[in-house]
Amino acid sequence: MQITSIAIVFFAAMGAVANPIARESDDLDARDVQLSKFGGECSLKHNTCTYLKGGKNHVVNCGSAANKKCKSDRHHCEYDEHHKRVDCQTPV
């Protein structure tokens, strides 16, 4: 009887140690991705997106395909710094 009790406690302890602990930073990772998007304005002449980050203007080239180019001058665009992508076709 005593060996059975010790075995149960031993296996319960092993199960507790073997299970991974859930990370709390999963929500923070999602928040960081959301905070890495910056809104800006398109330049039709240069086909670029200019956005403000940290008080400085940054310029990123839009795509050369028809569905990636700027629609019109001063049209809203969005740069995703996490994925390094620019979207010059975002609806306003």
UniProtKB/Swiss-Prot annotation:
S-S bridge residues: 42-70, 49-77, 62-88
Among Gene3D superfamilies, the record links this protein to: Antifungal protein domain
| The organism of origin for this protein | Penicillium chrysogenum (Penicillium notatum)
- Name used for this protein in its record: Antifungal protein B
- Where does it mainly reside? secreted
Instruction: Mark the transmembrane ranges.
Output: none
Q: Which family does it belong to?
A: Belongs to the antifungal protein pafB family.
How far does the signal peptide extend, from start to end residue? Answer: 1-18
Residues forming the propeptide are 19-34
Q: Which UniProt keywords apply?
A: Antimicrobial, Disulfide bond, Fungicide, Host cytoplasm, Secreted, Signal
Tell me the function of this protein.
Antifungal protein that acts as an inhibitor of growth of human pathogenic molds and yeasts. Is active against the model organism Neurospora crassa, the opportunistic human pathogens Aspergillus fumigatus, Trichophyton rubrum, and Aspergillus terreus. Provokes a reduction of the incidence of infections caused by Penicillium digitatum and Penicillium italicum in oranges and by Penicillium expansum in apples. Low doses of pafB have self-inhibition activity. Also shows activity against the model yeast Saccaromyces cerevisiae and the opportunistic human pathogen Candida albicans.
